[in-house]
Structure formats: structure tokens, C-alpha cells
Amino acid sequence: METSSSMSVETTRSVQVDEWQKNYCVVTSSICTPKQKADAYRALLLHIQYAYANSEISQVFATNLFKRYTEKYSAIIDSDNVVTGLNNYAESIFALAGSRQADSNKWQSGLSIDNVFKMSCVQEMMQAGKKFEESLLEPADASVVLCKEPTAFEVPQLSVCGGSEDADILSSSGHDTDKTQAIPGSSLRCSPFQSARLPKETNTTKTCLTSSTSLGESATAAFHMTPLFGNTEKDTQSFPKTSTGLNMFLSNLSCVPSGCENPQERKAFNDSDIIDILSNPTLNKAPSKTEDRGRREDNSLPTFKTAKEQLWVDQKKKGHQSQHTSKSSNGVMKKSLGAGRSRGIFGKFVPPVSNKQDGSEQHAKKHKSSRAGSAEPAHLTDDCLKNVEPRMVELIMNEIMDHGPPVHWDDIAGVEFAKATIKEIVVWPMMRPDIFTGLRGPPKGILLFGPPGTGKTLIGKCIASQSGATFFSISASSLTSKWVGEGEKMVRALFAVARCQQPAVIFIDEIDSLLSQRGDGEHESSRRIKTEFLVQLDGATTSSEDRILVVGATNRPQEIDEAARRRLVKRLYIPLPEASARKQIVGNLMSKEQCCLSDEETDLVVQQSDGFSGADMTQLCREASLGPIRSLHAADIATISPDQVRPIAYIDFENAFKTVRPTVSPKDLELYENWNETFGCGK
């Protein structure tokens, strides 16, 4: 049995040696890809951990090997060079920062004017248009006023534009003196080609809704529409709704010359089409019924616009939206449900259930906007915030920006090395940017890691206070949202406001929850937020002159992503307070209370509190301060004066030690020290 076990051990070792040699050859080879080298480095790190777990190598040797291969692995992962690195965030960064145009001038469309004319449906429409034009000349169809004032509805016409350079594109709408006048939308005509009329009504089952007309009025007629595409409707359908549909249909048709197969030329032509449509106010009106019955709600519908047209309107007519809205709406629209509700771009949404709190909510919004007053335009006039939503700027100003009291370096006990390093690389460069330029400039990010309760948050506030910078305190929950894309917008808004408030310090508490390592099971929204944060911190669009410092604090540094660790240049270990720091904490807290501790008793308290963090020392002093209160009888608490309460004594600390325990275990301290030796920048 012993022989078989020894043989199996030897076999396992030989396999491990073969794997080690194979991976080592991969990382030293010049023909392997960076991806293969990264996989080989990960395999080597696993071999090192396996050998150390089986006590095959010593701790010092394992630490040195792990540090060496981790640095080489990080160099491949974070390298921007395509030949020697993976550039792990390149695709996401290029997708966000790239603003190249998708259309090319050399692209040709497969759809031409000749192909359109050969389509059977277009041929049917042209034939139906000719029949309709002939039916208008029959006197029995309807009483039509010729060469008079405009009628209540007009004949729809559709002109197909052809390819002549001298063609009059988008000419103004003219009146046909031989027939009835054309409705809005028929102004889109081109002269070189014969007009192709829309199909008109061929059956006149209902005739002549005539009435006694006075001066300035004209007769109206209702016709029965014959559908072209097989859709049958009831005979009782009224003509105003049908004409409204035709009006909305015609307003979206555009004439394209034959030489406009190029997408960019076609886009320019469509933009000129939109200009003509928006400049003619009659295109937004639908024909009405008789004036004695008033205006119908359907006739006040604004003209429907596609997403491209609406985007053009927002870009070209910014600042005149209110005037455009008042011109496009005729009368007051009723709040109704169903098909009669306005569905245009200026229509207001009407919920199916009436909300009784609308009045109070509107009053609250008006009160809030009036209370903000002149403070809102102050931070919206900056060029950095022109593309940021005002509500996000207000949220950052009110909730994320910290307005607490200033913090001094003397308020932080111990951690002298961390304080000296921060003064050297952060505070002084922000105070004197004229001296600290070039390589002396401040870093983009700092990571403060260590056990909880050691003053990492206090150090972040002190950096902002002593450097005169604006302090932003955020967490992972303040950047997440249930709506898609809101988290990325909040990150962009945060850095935009920080650029306007330079110098600025962005403190992220528990940064491991925001910039954790990526995995296969990670949600897409958190990945996008993480990518946007890294791009804003150090990406293609960032400027080296920005004085924005990101300070991250965590007690789980091993869970931070490799790319985030690379951007957080200075990684400082904040250990547990030493004996002198614990004595300073006790002295500062007891100076505000009545205390009769001697120096020897204070030293005993400091000696017994070995392994306590700063938060543990505060809890110990708080528990000891309750000792004099507990010594009183319950009946005396209601009548005793504050001066009659005895001072805090050493016996109170002895009782406090029985209930207060250190919150950091030796195993956790060993983990922090090992991570500091591998990735830390301190002693």
C-alpha cells in the first residue's frame, strides 16, 4: 500500500511539473498571443497556491512567486498595446467614446424611382387616381364650388418626383382653378413628372350634406371611401375621420429625386422636406365639419412626426418649443380615453384612472421650483452641464455632495505614514497646482483599505477639507436605478458636476461593491455602470488637467477588479491604531466628559485594548461613560442634577471591557497584510 501511494504521489508531482513547464514555455514564448499568456499566468498562480496549500513550498517563496506572476499578469491585462496586451475594456470604451458616422458617401441604395413605378400597388394607385379625377367632373357626385373660397375639405393629391436637376422640389401649394383646391400635403409636388393622384371615392352612396350657406361658407360633402388594399369598413364611417387619416398620411410622404440614392443626400432632402412641412401651419390642421356644430376633437390633432423628424425639430428649434406647441394645437383638447385621445408628440398622457392627488402634486412641484429660484440657473449655465438632466444635477447637489463640518489632520489618530503620503501626493498638489505639474501632478485615484473602523472615511473628508476641494460622498446604491441607462447617466452627471466644482474629491465608501470583479453571472446594468465609471475616471475623453480625485475605501480589497485597481494608483493600508493612537483617542474622548483617570490608569486601558479599532475604542469609552449612570438608583435619575453624577473612573472601563470586544480577527489582519505586501504602496 505504501508503495502504491508513493507511486501516485510521484505521478501527481510529475504531472504538475509537466504542466508548470508547459505554461512557463507559453509565457516565455514570442509566438503566443496575449490571451494564451494570460491563461498561462493564471494557471501558474493556481499551481503556486496549490503547492503552498500542500506545504510543498514556504510562505516567503510562495509570496514572492505570487507577487511576480501577478504583476506580469496585470501588465498583460491592463496593457493598451494590441500586440502585448488584452486591453480588457477597449471594446466598451470605444463604443462609448466613438462618434464616427455610420453612413458612407459611397453606399448606394438598391431602391430607385424606376423600381417604385414598376410596383403593382403603385400602378393601381395611379389608375385609381385617374378614375377619381374623372369622377370629380361628374355633376351628380357632389356639389362642388369652383374658383371660389376654399371648401371645408380639399382633394388629396400625391405627386411623384422624378430626376431633373431643374425640378422645382417642394414648391408652394397652389390652387387648381379647374378643379377643387388641393388639401395640405398636396404642396409636395415636382414638375417634371406627371402627378399620380391618390385614389378618390368611386361610390357616392351618401351625397351632399348641404345646408343653407351664408356669405363665406361653402357646402360640404361626405363620401364613401373604397379601400385599395382589401380593408373593408362600415358605410356609416364619417368623412372627417377619413380625411384626417389621409392628411396624416400625406404629411409624411416625401418626394425623392432619382439621383438621391445616396443616404446622406437623401437625408438632406428629407430635412428640407421637414422644413417645408413645419413652415406651413396649415399642414397641422385637419378639415372641420360645419361651423355651427363646433370643432371636433379629432380635428385638433397635431400632425404625426417620425422619430427622425422629432429629433430634427428638437435640435433646430430648441428654445422655441412653447411657441411651436401653441401654433400646432387648435383649441383646447379634452381629457378622454380611447382612439379620440391625442397621440401626437404634443399630446398629454391621460391615465385610465383619475388621480385625485394631481392638484396637490402640481402645487408641490410649483412650490419646489419657486423655492429653488435662482439657485438652479446658477449651475445649469455651465457648458459642462448642458447635456446633463437638471434633476440629476439637483440630486447630486442635494444628496451626494457632502456639506458636513471641516475635518483636520489632528482629528485622525495614528496612521502617520498614510497622512504624510496623502499630504505629499494629494493635498499639496491641489493647493499649489502651479508647482505640481507634469510628473508631480496628483494621481487620479487612491484606495484606502484596511479593517473597518480605522478612519478611512474620516481621511477622505480630511482630504477635501484641507485641500479646499468639493467633497462628493457616494455609494453603490446612489448610482443604481431600476430604469435602464439611469445608472450610467448618474455617473456622467457626477463627473460633470465635479468638473464644474474643481478641485473635487469623490469619495466612494465600500468601493468593492461598485467596482467588483467581473464574472459570467454579472448583471448587464452593473457592468455598464462599472465601465462608465472607469471611462470617466481614466479614459479616452478625460483630460490630464482635471483636478478630480477619486478616493475609494474598502475592507475587502481582494474583490476589486484588476482594471479598477490599476486606476487607483496609490493603495494605502490603514491598519489598526497603535498604542499611542489609542491613547490619543481615549484622551480626546475623555476630555469632553468628567473623568478622573490618571496616566497610569490610562496606560492600563490602552494596554488592555490591544487589537481594538478606532470604532471599538469609541464604543469602549461610550460604554464606560454609562457606568456612573448605572450606579445610580432608578428613583434618583428623575431628581438628580448633572453636577451630582460622579466622574468616570477606571472601574467603569473594567466593566466596559466585559461587554466590548474587538471586531477584527487576527485572520482578517493577516489577509490585509498579505494584500498590502502584494499590491499595497505603503510600509
Curated annotation (Swiss-Prot):
ATP binds at A413, G453, T454, G455, K456, T457, L458. It is found in: Nucleus; Cytoplasm; Cytoplasm, Perinuclear region. Keywords: Acetylation, ATP-binding, Cytoplasm, Hydrolase, Magnesium, Metal-binding, Nucleotide-binding, Nucleus. Expressed at high level in the testis. Detected in pachytene spermatocytes and in metaphase spermatocytes (at protein level). CDD domains: RecA-like_Figl-1. Hexamer. Interacts (via N-terminal one-half region) with RAD51; the interaction is direct. Interacts (via N-terminal one-half region) with SPIDR (via the C-terminal region); the interaction is direct. Interacts with FIRRM; may regulate homologous recombination. This is Fidgetin-like protein 1. It comes from Mus musculus. The lineage of its organism: Eukaryota, Metazoa, Chordata, Craniata, Vertebrata.
